[in-house]
Amino acid sequence: MLVTIFTPTYNRIHTLPRLFDSLLGQTYKNFEWVVVDDGSTDYSYRMLERFKKIADFPVTIKRVGNGGKMRAVNEGVKLAKGEYFMILDSDDYLDLKAVETIADVSTRLPKHFGGMVFRKVDIALNAIAGAPLPSKKYDSNPIEVFYKLGIGGDKAEVIKTCIMKRYPFPEFDEEKFVPEGYVWN
């Protein structure tokens, strides 16, 4: 199963190497990295082109004018070939078994599940962020998880690509940000 790791980036030349190194070290190699450069002016695009040449996984890079994260996500979804789609911001990085875990968990999910949620590490604190997730599969949505289960904190969401294609983020004139919850709830 192919997983799409998607990164929207804007002037993050200083954080991209750590992210790329975490992708190079993945134990499960059946993934692609799709990057939309949202109009960077700091040579991020040149760095991404160098990464593409040395990567041992497929890399797709698209350069667009600065339109904000959600427009970049919509572009990334259009380019995605994976069954699952994970947004990995340019200042994030993955545990070396992250994609392997995604692939493993996805094989055990009921067909009607639209995705998976994992906890993230707070880099500044060097600790796992937010409250623990339920130990068993839980059929829910982000609002219920937050209000009913009391689980807050930043999470790593992995959504079926077909759902992302069906429900793109809205794009508003003069607005560059739409919270993920607008679509995912």
For the regions a language model picked out, list residue spans one by one:
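Cell-envelope/extracellular polymer assembly enzymes that use nucleotide-activated donors
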Residues: 2-4, 32
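Short, well-formed alpha-helical segments that are part of the catalytic scaffolds
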Residues: 12-25
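A conserved acidic beta->alpha catalytic loop
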Residues: 22, 37-47, 89
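Short beta-strand/loop segment that forms part of the nucleotide-sugar
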Residues: 30-39, 60-64
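Glycine-rich, basic loop-to-helix element that forms the pyrophosphate-binding segment
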Residues: 63-80
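Short aromatic/hydrophobic "clamp" motif used to bind/position activated sugar donors
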Residues: 85
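Conserved donor NDP-sugar-binding/catalytic core segment of glycosyltransferases
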Residues: 97-130
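Conserved nucleotide-sugar donor-binding catalytic segment
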Residues: 122, 129-185
